[in-house]
């Protein structure tokens, strides 16, 4: 996506005839133009009266679109459902001012940049889900079927209320809730698709590759490496060998919603499964299972209780630099040698691997459980004075395991840890001490817990055509967590089935272990005042004071207007 400049001019790269340009702006009707032979367009957007009256969720506050003075982009429930993204960030693709980059692996976390490169220590935006502060990592645990709306806050006017943590932009997500006075409504959605590479990278074939190596060798005074290149042909297309054209992507979700005069509910469960584009479906996949229960009820005519809870389980497995090796492996090398083992290159001996052998030798898995939710009380103290008290929490438990088997990529190769028959390599030093190579298994268990407590109040009032909306709040929070990890050698039968710390039988002096833990606390005060005159002239003023144990010793507090 792109933005216009101050005068409304814009340019976009890599657009081809037949592509569709989508022009949108908050409060205006979206317009689509199909690219033909023209290279310049005059685009006029028409005001959308309904869109101007739409209420946009900005996190702590909500405003009519017509009264927002800052920069905000929105994604509706209908847009999310039509896109059917695996990760919620994918639904932001193409929004003005939002740049995204991903490596394409199943469930992979993309890089999302909203306000450009703003920090040496990271540019990930802050994520708010139903008022709960999360990070970009947590978006992987959300089921797109549960999403009601997404707002992306992009400038200082809209993000200042979040202080220093909003400096990279803020993504505000609201999940679905049931409607009151509605009978139970059940919904089931399922989808199936297949993924394939859109294009591959052009590389040398075997004949071209051999000719260049011959020229290089002769120019340095050596002999021809390939005396007869006429019989080589195109050789091995390694990208064709590693990529699939039918990688499945499935999604299922079921929900129930409804409510009575004073109560509403929304309950859902979902599953998403994605296999990678690289062969070996058990080596590269992403599976997500979710359960959500949102509930709100009137405890009295002035007091409302809201309870949201969700659980998610993520299972994933990934591969390393397979594509790198496919692009750099010699096309003169076949996939398999004459004896049925994976072939090795005679010209690349230290770093590049046969990518099919690398897939076969790659083992790893991750399992992540997340519980997150909030308990919120909303009290109407006066007609236009509302007080909110909210406790949000998130607990994450992660278990990861990896296995490095005995593997042979050629004598002297950096990754070789076994002989060609996959037996250990033994060495004897001058004193007669014998050492050998080992296969190994590693495991880690991480846990993270965070909570935030918010107490805030908002007051709306008007005097003639002067309209005011005042907000003030207090927040405290804590993040804590830790990890233990270990590795051992000597996995029985050189098998993933026996890759476990308790099963490894190698010597104790080859055993490794480690641990870490962290804790941080923060406290914040914030205030915001919004003013409009007859909904034509707008102004907003925001200030926040943050204190954090993560700040420098002499700067524990700071103001962020």
Features from the language model and the residues they span:
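Residues embedded in well-ordered regular secondary structure
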Residues: 74, 81-85, 94-101, 105-113, ...
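Short acidic/polar hinge/loop motifs at secondary-structure boundaries
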Residues: 10-14, 79, 84, 130-158
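Surface-exposed loop/interface segments of Gram-negative outer-membrane beta-barrel transport/assembly proteins
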Residues: 180-236, 272, 277-372, 390, ...
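Non-catalytic regulatory/gating segments with a bias toward low-complexity or hydrophobic composition
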Residues: 92, 131, 150-151, 171-173
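Outer-membrane beta-barrel channels and translocator barrels
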Residues: 85, 249, 260-261, 296, ...
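Periplasm-facing N-terminal accessory domains of Gram-negative outer-membrane beta-barrel systems
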Residues: 1-54
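Repeated loop/turn-to-beta-strand initiation elements of outer-membrane beta-barrel proteins
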Residues: 262-265, 302-305, 384-387, 465-468, ...
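N-terminal periplasmic "start-of-domain" segments of outer-membrane beta-barrel proteins
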Residues: 1-9, 56-81, 108-111, 125-126, ...
């Amino acid at each position: 996506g792109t933005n216009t400049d101050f005068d409304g001019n814009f340019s976009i790269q890599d657009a081809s005839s037949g592509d569709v340009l989508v022009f949108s702006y908050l409060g205006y009707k979206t317009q689509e133009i199909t690219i033909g032979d023209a290279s310049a367009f005059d685009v006029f957007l028409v005001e959308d009266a309904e869109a101007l009256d739409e209420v946009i969720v900005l996190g702590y506050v909500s405003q009519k679109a017509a009264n927002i003075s800052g920069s905000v982009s929105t994604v509706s429930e209908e847009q999310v459902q039509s896109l059917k993204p695996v990760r919620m960030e994918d639904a932001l693709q193409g929004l003005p001012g939002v740049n995204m980059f991903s490596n394409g692996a199943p469930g992979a976390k993309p890089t999302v940049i909203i306000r450009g490169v703003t920090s040496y220590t990271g540019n990930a935006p802050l994520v708010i889900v139903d008022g709960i502060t999360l990070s970009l990592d947590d978006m992987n645990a959300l089921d797109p079927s549960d999403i009601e709306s997404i707002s992306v806050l992009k400038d200082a006017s809209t993000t200042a209320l979040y202080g220093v943590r909003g400096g990279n932009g803020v993504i505000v997500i609201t999940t679905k809730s049931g409607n009151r006075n509605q009978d139970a409504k059940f919904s089931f959605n399922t989808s199936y698709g297949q993924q394939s590479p859109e294009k591959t990278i052009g590389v040398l074939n075997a004949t071209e590759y051999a000719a260049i190596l011959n020229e290089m060798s002769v120019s340095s005074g050596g002999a021809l490496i390939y005396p007869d290149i006429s019989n080589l042909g195109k050789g091995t297309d390694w990208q064709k060998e590693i990529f699939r054209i039918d990688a499945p992507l499935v999604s299922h979700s079921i929900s129930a919603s409804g409510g009575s005069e004073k109560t509403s509910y929304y309950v859902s469960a979902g599953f998403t499964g994605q296999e990678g584009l690289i062969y070996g479906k058990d080596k590269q996949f992403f599976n997500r299972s979710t359960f959500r229960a949102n509930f709100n009820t009137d405890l009295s005519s002035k007091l409302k209780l809201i309870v949201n809870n969700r659980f998610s389980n993520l299972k994933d497995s990934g591969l390393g630099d397979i594509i790198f090796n496919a692009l750099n492996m010699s096309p003169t090398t076949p996939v398999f040698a004459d004896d049925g083992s994976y072939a090795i290159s005679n010209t690349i001996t230290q770093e590049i691997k046969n990518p099919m052998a690398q897939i076969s030798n790659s083992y790893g898995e991750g399992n992540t459980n997340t519980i997150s939710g909030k308990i919120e009380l909303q009290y109407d103290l006066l007609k236009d004075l509302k007080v909110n008290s909210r406790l949000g929490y998130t607990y994450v438990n992660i278990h990861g395991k990896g296995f490095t088997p005995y593997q042979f990529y050629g004598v002297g190769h950096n990754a070789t840890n076994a002989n060609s028959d996959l037996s250990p390599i033994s060495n004897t030093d001058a004193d007669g001490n014998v050492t050998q190579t080992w296969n190994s298994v590693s495991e880690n268990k991480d846990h993270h817990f965070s909570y935030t407590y918010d107490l805030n109040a908002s007051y709306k009032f008007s005097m003639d055509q002067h309209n005011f909306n005042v907000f003030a709040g207090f927040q405290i929070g804590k993040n804590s967590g830790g990890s233990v990890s270990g590795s051992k050698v000597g996995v029985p039968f050189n098998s993933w089935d026996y890759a476990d710390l308790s099963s490894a039988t190698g010597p104790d002096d080859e055993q490794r272990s480690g641990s870490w833990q962290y804790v941080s606390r923060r406290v914040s005060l914030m205030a915001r005042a919004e003013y409009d005159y007859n909904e034509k002239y707008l102004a907003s003023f925001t200030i926040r004071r943050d204190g954090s144990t993560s700040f420098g010793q002499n700067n524990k507090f700071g103001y962020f207007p």
